[in-house]
Amino acid sequence: MDVETWRHYFRVAKSYGINHYRFHSWCPPEACFEAADIEGIYLQAELPFWGWMGKDNTRLISYLREEGLRIQQEYGHHASFVMFALGNELSGDFEVMQSLVDTFRQADRRHLYAYGSNNYLGFKAGFGRTPGMETIVVD
């Protein structure tokens, strides 16, 4: 979609009182950020991941780290980019998640960071705010 199409959707959303868009397990394109900047919409980008994060999966962790840094480099300057999450309904090793969030926060302190959206659904141990997270996303 182009900037004007995104602007149309954001204006409709605003007419219903919506001011925040979460992009489930993906990052929207440049046109979306440009339109959101113009229309005053807050955006939450996410890494393209949904599942278990473990220390042993070094290839995955490396990919997510590199992808997150690329997303920040490409879109982080937009005023509409207010939140960044590691993915959707994640579970796994808190240390791995904390390491990724720390890396992203050090690269760009302008955003709010979360380990993920709707994390640890059905798992009592991970319920609620976790140290190192600045926001909790549940929808």
Show where each model-derived region lies.
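Substrate-binding/catalytic cleft of secreted carbohydrate-active enzymes
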Residues: 20-139
